Amino acid sequence: MIKTKITEMLNIKHPIVQGGMHYVGFAEMAAAVSNAGGLGIITGLTQPTPDDLAKEIARCHEMTDKPFGVNLTFLPGFAAPDYPGYIKAIIEGGIKIVETAGRSPEAFMPPLKEAGIKVIHKCTSVRHALKAEKIGCDAASVDGFECGGHPGEDDIPNMILLPRAAEELKIPFIASGGMGNAQQLVAALAMGAEGINMG
């Protein structure tokens, strides 16, 4: 067992967080990760409506008594999802950890913080991680260019990005992108991360 600021903050055994993954992050996977000692994540927008997310959260509670979280990605667009509805489902479902991604979660921080929810924001640069810290996020997921899905615009690999994040951030951060085994976990910890994000 490795004890870090992230394991203590999230009340997990291992400093491993399952990243939100569209069309994959269902209750079964989240519960399996949480039962193994990491932090499982349900991908919020994989659920078509807030009511569907509420049902998925309830299913996950039936499969694990360990902490798990919900990913909520804020996307630009003309027809935004019902973010207030998803946040209501998260709060009413007793979720205490939310992983945010995409645009800044600043507009949605008040209800999350009022509910006592820990917010981890995915960032592809140190400047975005500093902004996450400034708006009250509890931790950052620092995503190097190796990450899948949404690698950002700066193309900075983790070997450069993680040590810079460690120099600048006061909040704990986890390393994301290219993390897949114990050696990479150890390397991430050596570069200042408090854990890793896989998936």
What are these regions (language model features)?
Residues 1-168, 172:
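Active-site entrance/lid segments in N-terminal catalytic domains of soluble metabolic enzymes
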Residues 36-37, 136, 192-194, 199:
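Active-site-proximal glycine-rich helix-loop-beta segment
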Residues 156-198:
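Catalytic alpha/beta core domains of metabolic enzymes, predominantly
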